[in-house]
A protein has these predicted regions:
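Helix-adjacent hinge/juxtasegments
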Residues: 21-63
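Short, contiguous alpha-helical
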Residues: 1-29, 69-130
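Short polybasic amphipathic segments
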Residues: 64-68
């Protein structure tokens, strides 16, 4: 639960910076989410928000800088923030997947999203199909 809450917190922090929402580090003041179902719902909403942000981007937006809150404003390129955010997601989602694999709980599908062969049904739910 701690890993998934951390992942959600970091997603919120960076997406707020990308959208110039002004919350900055105060996103850490949001309460932890206590149940797996509520975490799933919150993460899915955050994923949809990130997808919508990316859908609105133009190529000319990528080198533009937005401020991140590090106790002081630190400008970062949008493309660099997105790359960092995606890497962070991959790392911690993989970490949670590995933890579940060591239990009796079947971890979610993480592999087959883009190829036609063995594509997982959740691809359609996520709007990843062309």
């Amino acid at each position: 639960k701690a890993t998934l809450n951390h992942n959600l917190l970091v997603d919120r922090y960076y997406l707020d910076a990308l959208e110039q929402g002004g919350l900055g580090r105060t996103v850490a003041d949001l309460p932890e989410i206590g149940t797996p179902a509520a975490l799933r719902t919150a993460q899915a909403a955050q994923d949809r928000r990130l997808t919508a942000f990316c859908d609105r981007l133009e190529a000319s937006d990528l080198p533009r800088r937005v401020d991140t809150d590090r106790g002081r404003p630190v400008p970062e390129r949008i493309d660099h923030l997105l790359a960092h955010l995606f890497q962070h997601q991959i790392h911690h989602r993989g970490q949670a997947h590995a933890m579940l694999a060591g239990t009796g709980v079947a971890p979610p599908q993480l592999d087959e999203f883009f190829l036609d062969y063995d594509r997982h049904p959740s691809v359609a739910e996520l709007g990843l199909l062309p």
